[in-house]
Amino acid sequence: MGGQVRVAIVGAGGRMGRTLIEAAYHQEHILLGAAIERAGSSLVGVDAGELAGVGKLNVIIMDSLDYATDDFDVLIDFTAPDASIVHLDWCVRHKKAMVIGTTGFNQAQKIQINAFAEQTPVVMAPNMSVGVNLMWKLLELAAEVMGDYTDIEIIEGHHRHKKDAPSGTALKMGEVIAKTLGRDLEKCAVYGREGITGERDRETIGFATIRAGDLVGEHTAMFADIGERLEITHKASSRMTFANGAMRAARWVVEQKPGLYDMQQVLGLN
């Protein structure tokens, strides 16, 4: 991965967008080529570096990718499902690689992403933290050893502004555990409990969601038996961990053939 990779960041004015700009500034092998905000945003025309608090970068926030076609190699997108689909379509038409950190896609949108990825390289992951991706590997081992005789619960917490629940990371945790145990998550997942629920079914995987304050992201998988329980927890204290992972993915994906990849592949954990 020699030389600099030029990245464009959409949703540049949001919390994650500003963190991505800061991460790009601090990474030796990354060059911020473009920063995009929605049409009509008051941030259009602002210097991206000044917005992110790293000083002037001479990268002016624009309101369309069409103005930046020649300025970047990889698009980084942590926006919203509908917007990400539009951006991916643009990347296919302009032969750009893409890193997607957006969560909350429905099944139809996932099918669209798979189809688009046949024409351009895409890394998509619900969480780009190195620690979270290692946690998924640990969950495989825990499920293999303890999953068939323990009650499995997944608890996640995020800031009050997060729009989807459970988080994409929590759902991925459930998918990893269910796949390891030969279960179908759509059939065994229980999302919240209320009222008289009856005795717990050992085959289920429970999900609990917290939305409060400025929690960046906390995820715990509990394997509970009589007399003991194992908890595997990841806590993010800053969005920078996700941004740094996205930069790592950008450097990696630009050298790949068309296809849909995840952070496990970026990190060599597969």
Curated annotation (Swiss-Prot):
- Alphabetized InterPro entries for the sequence: DapB_C (IPR022663), DapB_N (IPR000846), DapB_N_CS (IPR022664), DHDPR_bac (IPR023940), NAD(P)-bd_dom_sf (IPR036291)
What role does it play? Catalyzes the conversion of 4-hydroxy-tetrahydrodipicolinate (HTPA) to tetrahydrodipicolinate.
Q: Which HAMAP family match?
A: DapB
PANTHER family in the record, alphabetically?
A: 4-HYDROXY-TETRAHYDRODIPICOLINATE REDUCTASE 1, CHLOROPLASTIC-RELATED, DIHYDRODIPICOLINATE REDUCTASE
Catalytic activity from the UniProt record: (S)-2,3,4,5-tetrahydrodipicolinate + NAD(+) + H2O = (2S,4S)-4-hydroxy-2,3,4,5-tetrahydrodipicolinate + NADH + H(+); (S)-2,3,4,5-tetrahydrodipicolinate + NADP(+) + H2O = (2S,4S)-4-hydroxy-2,3,4,5-tetrahydrodipicolinate + NADPH + H(+)
* Transmembrane domains' residue ranges: none
NCBIfam families in the cross-refs: dapB (TIGR00036)
The name of this protein is 4-hydroxy-tetrahydrodipicolinate reductase
GO CC, sorted alphabetically, is: cytosol
Q: What is the lineage of its organism?
A: Bacteria, Pseudomonadati, Pseudomonadota, Gammaproteobacteria, Alteromonadales
Family stated for the protein in its record: Belongs to the DapB family.
Pathway(s) this gene product operates in, as recorded in its UniProt entry: Amino-acid biosynthesis; L-lysine biosynthesis via DAP pathway; (S)-tetrahydrodipicolinate from L-aspartate: step 4/4
Which EC number(s) does UniProt give? 1.17.1.8
Ligand binding (NAD(+)): G11, A12, G13, G14, R15, M16, E37, G101, T102, T103, A125, P126, N127, M128
Alphabetical list of Pfam families matching this protein = DapB_C, DapB_N
State the Gene Ontology BP annotations: diaminopimelate biosynthetic process; lysine biosynthetic process via diaminopimelate
